[in-house]
């Protein structure tokens, strides 16, 4: 249903007043604090109509209203005025990264801190799966008997260690030859491509060093990442939720429980983040577990390739006009840094 300009102006003012003050909003407040150009009586009439349409609801008998999920949805989609980050805020973000070592995990830790601190909400950053990163170098090292340590150095700066066990002894010289052969042929490809296509093709050609076809299947299997691992999930700002939901104990308990379900968060941030742009999930339009919560998400890239995602999690009365540009600016900065790390 299309809203008239006056309905849109009143809904916009009501959402912003409620975000600012966290109290039900009445016609008198809107008339006095916002330049809507309407009398209190007309505003009261419009508020009643907005309530009938499901955009706002009366929380108490006092007459004040608060936005519904539908009201927030319309506000975010078409009414919000985005504020540009101040120069000081941009400097603060950049300074946080300068304090970190330029490794992927350190960049993602800094990202979670920045988002939580400046949004005054919780933050989640999902690092790349090993299969989405590209290989820079592989090293096979003999440990003991049939045990081999495989070290995968990825373009992003991530270093993965995998133990491989064989039923027979393998010399370090053989492992050196296989390492060199793999580096010559699979460097620059992602792990999934190496596992599913390149190593099988190399085995069929039978051109590798002695023993390669015998060892290759185990090497390919060991390259795989555990899809249930949550080691690449970075969370910060949970303390902000205590302030955000201090008057809503049941809601606070539900959202803190959500952060205990790290596998759910990982899957959610893998599935709900768009290929481009910033996406806002309001309440149960994302999942039944998210009632009363807003999640703002986006992805970050290495070059042109999307390798991970990030998000801000907080109450629906979030300061959208600051949170949306914050996550957009941060994702672009992170993408630039990770792309440089990969070169």
From Swiss-Prot:
Keywords: Repressor, Stress response, Transcription, Transcription regulation. The keyword Repressor applies. Gene3D superfamilies: 3.30.450.40, Heat-inducible transcription repressor hrca homolog, domain 3, Winged helix-like DNA-binding domain superfamily/Winged helix DNA-binding domain. GO terms for biological process: negative regulation of DNA-templated transcription. Signal peptide: none annotated. InterPro entries: GAF-like_dom_sf, HrcA, HrcA_C, WH-like_DNA-bd_sf, WH_DNA-bd_sf, WHTH_transcript_rep_HrcA_IDD. GO terms for molecular function: DNA binding. It holds the Pfam family HrcA. Negative regulator of class I heat shock genes (grpE-dnaK-dnaJ and groELS operons). Prevents heat-shock induction of these operons. Belongs to the HrcA family. This is Heat-inducible transcription repressor HrcA. It comes from Leptospira biflexa serovar Patoc (strain Patoc 1 / Ames). The lineage of its organism: Bacteria, Pseudomonadati, Spirochaetota, Spirochaetia, Leptospirales.
